[in-house]
Amino acid sequence: MSAYHVGQLVDKMSNPDKDFRFMACNDLMKDLQTGTIALEDDSTAKVIRALIKLLSDSNGEVQNLAIKCIGLLAQPSKIKTHHLEYLVEELTPHVFSKAEQSRDIHSLTLKAMILNLAPSASSNATTTVVKRMLPKFVDSLSLCAPDDAARVDVLDLIGEVLLRFGDVVPEMHKGSLKVMVDHLYSFRSAIRKKAITGIGHLASVINGELYDELVQDLLKELAQRSPPSSAAQNVQLRTLVIALSTVARASGSRFSKHTPKVVPFLLQYLQIDPGTESEHDDLREASIQGLEVFLYRNPQEVVAFEKEVIQQLTDALAYDPNYEYGDDDEDEQMEDDEDDDEDEYSDDEDVTWKVRRAAAKAIEAMISSHRESLLNLSQKIGPVVIGRFKEREETVRTEIISVYIALLNQISILVPDLQKAVVAADEDSIETDDIVVIGGTKFSTNYLSRSQLAIIQSLADQKDVLLRTITKSMKKHPKTGPKCIELLSALIRTYPSGLEDSLDDIIPAVSNILTDKNASAQGKMTVLSFISNALTLNNPKRFKNLLSPLTTIMTHSISEPFYKVSAEGLAVCCKYIDVLRELSACGGNEEAKKLLVVVEKKFMANDTDQEVRERAISAISMLLAAFKDVLKNETPAILEKMTERIGRDMTCLVAFRASTHIVEAGIIFSSAQLQSILRHVVDYVKKIARSLRMTCLNFVEKLMKHSPAGSIPVEELTCVLGEMSNLISETDLQITNQAFCCLTYAFLNFPTCVSLHMQPILDSIIRLLTSPLIQGLALNSLLNLFTAIVKTDFPEKPTFESLLDSVTSPVYDNVALSRHAHMAIASCAAVITESTQNLEKSRSLAKKLAQQLQTANMSDSIRLFAMITLGELGRRVPDTYSPDFPVKPEDLAIKAFNHHHEDLKSAAAQALGALAVGNLNVYLPFILEQIRTQPKKQYLLLHALKEVIVWESSSEESTKSTDLFRSAIVDIWGMLMANAGGNEDGTRSVVAECLGRLCSFDPESLLPKLKESMRSSDPAIRSSAVSAIKYMINDEKRIVDITLQKQIGDFLAAVRDEDLKVRRVALVVLNSAAHNKPALVRDLLPDLLPAVYEETKLRKELIKEVEMGPFKHQVDEGLDLRKCAFECMFTLLESCVDKIDITQFSSVMEVGLSDQNHDVKLLNYLTLQRVANLAPGQVLQRIDRVCEPLKTQLNVRPRGNAVKQEVEKLEELKKAVIRVVYGLKLKLPEVERNPQFLDLYNTIKHTKELEALANDVLKESQRAVVYDTPMETA
């Protein structure tokens, strides 16, 4: 912007017309916001003078814009430092003006400047301005003695400066602190509040000596004024208590050593006799609020007072000296009288409700911060809290209900796998399970520890009283109904079977809340969320007598005008339909008809919200599918509308999903409707939208699978199938897999429609077979497709030979193929051969392949293919290799072991294993004999053996082969143990996997043998033994778990092994167990965790210097071990948090935040976010120590000669830090009061590079939203 334009703006600012002044300020503000203005020195001075003058403008809107403009000028790089100093000099004197308006305007302007200044670490200008500003404010308070109103403004400004830039002016800390402390004793409460706030901001930045002096002075004043003897002393004590609480909140762990000195005073103030000292209620409230702070910030220091704190808080929760509650029965009889009595009291007459509310919040803090005492708290506090649900004040009652919700949330964190531990009545339980019955529900002790069972027992003991009380409260206090529902939702999530016996009472009460005309939309959403959980987590038979109220809930919520409630009602309706289907013989059919009326109305409407329309489409499809016989008359109109919805871009995706559900139920669209739908499919599969293509393919697959012959229009289906060849590609194997499934059903059920496209389809398949990516589900689907092609008769069907030649053409045409591609082609060839069910063709192919394998001039690619295919033929068509057959594939495999081509050697091992899988009786003894006699080929032979063991451990075949295999286990075990101590890591890895899988067959006898090998002096053998345990662990319930749980501790003790590699393997096994089956290791953690923490330390003796040519490079041999330890911590935090001391855990994590390794840092950033979710108080207590390494990382700059990879890694770390900062800001609102965190956050906001990265992080988080959510069917 030119100086001329700036001059014009300045002229307009002094124009007599207020509209000109307003527009000039507005234009300047926009230019400053967008950065389109660059002020020169002279222009800046003119603008500043004009804006200062406008602060006294007669028009309020102009004044407000002037304030905003001055604030924007204070932003980084807008104006020079001396101009900022000038602004401070000009504005500060007006803060002490006797004219109230002038004082307020200039105070707001200075505050706007403070808020816009750059973080001190990145701006010298900020430091200069703050050092000019703060002394003026402090001196004015101590010397000028302005009136009280000015004091409030100045204290507020000092507080803002200290909050954001307290670390910039350490020389002013002592003076600022003295001023703040002096104002603690002012007679004006507003001044006292500002002084307390300022002390809190200072507490987080002052040095240790000044900090201790501050706390000691406050404690001294507290002691001198205790106990209170007058109203004035009450006020002073309350102020001191709040000041100490604020200091503790701001400084966290720094206050720890002072906490034991403060808590006794607070407990003393709570013991004052309420009968004679009712004026102490404000002091009681402040004392309880102080306890809440200490419980969150210094929980370990409060443990010594736990018993007395619980007693005082529970007493305070019931502290209501002005009201007599009476017995419960009496309450019910005198309900109306009681309501009248409540109207007699108001906040002005009775402030005891504040004490009770504070007590509720403090109890919640104790529950959240003392997780290690949760059983004791549940037993002692739980019943008291339930008894206080009768509280007469709504705000207090809401807080009390929140306390029990917090208790349930903490229990759900400590017992996250409760539903897995439930043993259903019809479940085939493992015979040796230890079953514990709690509240009528059977639990397996293999999934729950003793402490977890005790907590669930405590909850079960309180459940009946809780549900009776909460049901009564919902009827008696409709306003707190949604909060009661929130509690019930928490209960059903924590203790899924807890509501089964009480649903008959709860559902009608919930229905009344939803249908109440005064209920809020949020309240209705809460009710529907509870109903959803109840329907999902309870047996449908439990709702047999509740269909009518449930239908009322559904119809009322679906008909709700507010779209959010209506959409949620339709979502819950989908789950209700499942219940109705199970109870169709008990009135479900009639309720379905009622439900259809409201759902169909939403489905047919064209003017509804998009979300409601989509949910209605899903719900109507589920209704039709579940009650197709009952709703026959309504079906045609619905199918016609569904066809219309498919043709619209906004609803086609969800309509296709719904239509898939409909055709799976056997409901038939008319021929005309299918013609329209299939034409749309042809168009949609060509579009970019991946989710739409997949949904279309799924619909076509289910349509062909479930539709009777002649019901699908041939011409349109042929067109759809013609598009399949274009969808077969390595770029998207999921869509390719779906296309293969469609083609399989097409060849089986509609061969004439697909035969026209045989060649394009085959060409696409052959192109795909050259890809190294074809494996897994896509390969399995392709094999099924070839089976369908071979077994189905259709016009111009290719012969066996031509089909085989086409599939194997990439091998013989010398196309460059990966090993995965060779395996895929070999599998296809074997499946095609198997599908012919012609043994002669199989043997002919085997002879041909054997000849190619032995021909000297054959390419390595053909040899590799021949070897794999010979093995696959043995797996799939074992009769090929009869005793009199001249080709001996086992001899060919052994011979291939001597080949120079490594891939051929591996293929031979795999082929030998495949042969044994197909014919265990012949080839397993052969493999074992070779292992005994061929020591130089052990590695390859062990791979062949592993192929057999893996197949047997996962086989669903008859027990014949398994019995045969079991008889050989002893021989196999001996051979494996003989190779467990090899020097090659690959061999030991194979041996470990085989040992682990073998132990699953006979854990009682084999695990002790494996344990004996832990005594070996060879660390390689110990490593193999520990690693074997990893292959015994998965997330399924198996009989091996019982034996493993008893003995796994002996293997995990290797975390203290003298060998580094053994320790690393032990940590990997611990991590695997904690992730897949935490019950195996939960009770061992008190002993194992110290060893895990020990391995997170950086050990300098393990850092070696290696010379690489002219360069020296440092190699950290302990890095892998350190990574494993931190990974283990991360996993344990999710699955075994009940056994973790969060304080000790957080200390180890903090060290990891400063680790030099990129991966370790990223892992600890994730861990920090998880700790913030589970124990927010712990993070708040240590926020200073957390912020320091985060800020250090943000300030790291790449080396001048850094390569691209280094720059990208650094950028990744900075993005991770930004995610952590934003996550902490979202999860912990109080964190914004901390100067260190605020400085960290402002560093991101005011640094261009970091701000750009932050924008990228936000965009990435938005892209991470999953739009392709499946239709709700459960």
Swiss-Prot record:
Reported consequences of knocking out the gene: Worms show impenetrant phenotypes, including developmental arrest, morphological defects of the vulva and tail and reduced fecundity. Worms also display supernumerary seam cell divisions, defective alae formation, and the accumulation of the SCF(lin-23) target, the glutamate receptor glr-1. Increased levels of the neddylated isoforms of Cul-2 and cul-4.
InterPro entries attached to this UniProt entry: ARM-like, ARM-type_fold, CAND1/CAND2, TATA-bd_TIP120
Keywords: Nucleus, Repeat, Ubl conjugation pathway
Source domain of life: Eukaryota
Repeat (HEAT) residue spans along the chain: 41-79, 127-167, 375-413, 500-540, 617-655, 671-709, 1000-1038, 1041-1078, 1079-1117
Subcellular locations according to the entry: Nucleus
GO CC annotations on file: nucleus
Main location: nucleus
Keyword Repeat assigned: yes
Start and end residues of each stretch annotated as Disordered: 320-349
Biased composition (Acidic residues): 325-349
Pfam family name, one: TIP120
One of the protein's GO biological processes: SCF complex assembly
Keyword Repeat: yes
Function: Key assembly factor of SCF (SKP1-CUL1-F-box protein) E3 ubiquitin ligase complexes that promotes the exchange of the substrate-recognition F-box subunit in SCF complexes, thereby playing a key role in the cellular repertoire of SCF complexes. Acts as a F-box protein exchange factor.
Family: Belongs to the CAND family.
Assembly and binders: Interacts with cul-1, cul-2, cul-3, cul-4, cul-5 and cul-6.
Full protein name: Cullin-associated NEDD8-dissociated protein 1
Species: Caenorhabditis elegans
Underlying gene: cand-1
